[in-house]
Amino acid sequence: MRTLHLLGWPIWAIIEHLDEFKNQGFDSIQITPVQPLKEEGPGEWWLPYQPVNFEIGNWFGSKEDLCKLCNETSIRGMRTFVDVVCNHLASQPFTGSLEPHDSVPDKYKHNPNFWKPKRNVTNWNNRHEVISLCMGLPGLNITNDEVQHEIFKFLDELVKCGVKGFRFDAAKSIGLPEEGVHFWDRIANRYKTLPDFEIYGEVIFGSTELIDSYGKYMKVLTNIYQGRHPENVILFAESHDSFNDEDLNKYSNSWTDEQVAYKYRDLCDRFENTMYYARPNNDHSWNNPIVKDANNRGQKIKVLYR
């Protein structure tokens, strides 16, 4: 599986480039979160990760646009994956607020059972903190059945549109069944058996043991893996976080397009599932011969896992 990550791309622009993506050897695309946002428009890179509810449609495209995209990718033998934000919702405009944004529905805002305690994680090595507290935004209480009902309703609508996979943002902050949180097992039971469908969650800077624990329920999107189950991971050389996030010192921002492409090619030589981040306003970052060669050469790796 060779996935192109298209954060910040309007759906109409993605449709226009599908043949080029296919020609580059990508068999799937991951698009920007489709939930309504607290500020609509081509703003900061992190805005798509501050949704206000669990509906479909924002500045990047409507529900009808999404259905059209899914049809167009299917025609080309490709798949569309949607980035899903369900660990938290948007905050008030002032920095550091853990209060829900005014646009969050009242039935969410005024239900105390919907939310995690209004405290941030201080120790990221403490699993209880990571899954129980907030990460700078109003955290949703995933253990609550009402919250899960809203999420599943949204995911079911995505499936009806023709979406063929979900990428769960901040999956590491949602606990495992072994930790008393019955979300990932329900996700797996509900969607894993759908034909040609992918479920994967973001677990970056996690131990091999933690990655393998999440791997029981889905594929794991991560930046490094040295375990025994490579078929359960999706590797990236660069992500939207490593390129844009000040908290990570934008550590890949200084890499040239060619450096990223060669790092990606190395991953394709070793792993069956990889993701390539399309740098903003830079078609050369994904549309270059090294990436095409990586995708085509990398298909041979499948033989090793069968």
Feature locations, PLM:
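Active-site-proximal helices and loops of the catalytic beta/alpha 8
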Residues: 2, 16-22, 33-35, 40-49, ...
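A short alpha/beta connector and helix-capping loop motif
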Residues: 94-117, 181-202
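Aromatic-lined carbohydrate-binding surfaces of glycoside hydrolases
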Residues: 33-38, 84-104
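Aromatic- and acidic-residue-enriched carbohydrate-binding clefts of CAZyme catalytic domains
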Residues: 1, 35-71, 100-141
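An active-site-proximal structural segment forming one wall of the substrate-binding cleft
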Residues: 11-14, 20-24, 28, 69-78, ...
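Residue-level preference for long, well-ordered alpha-helices that form the structural scaffold
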Residues: 58, 62, 143-147, 176, ...
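Short glycine-centered, acidic/aromatic-flanked micro-motifs in structured strand/loop junctions
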Residues: 6, 56, 170
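Active-site mouth loops of central-metabolism enzymes
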Residues: 2-12, 136-150, 248-256
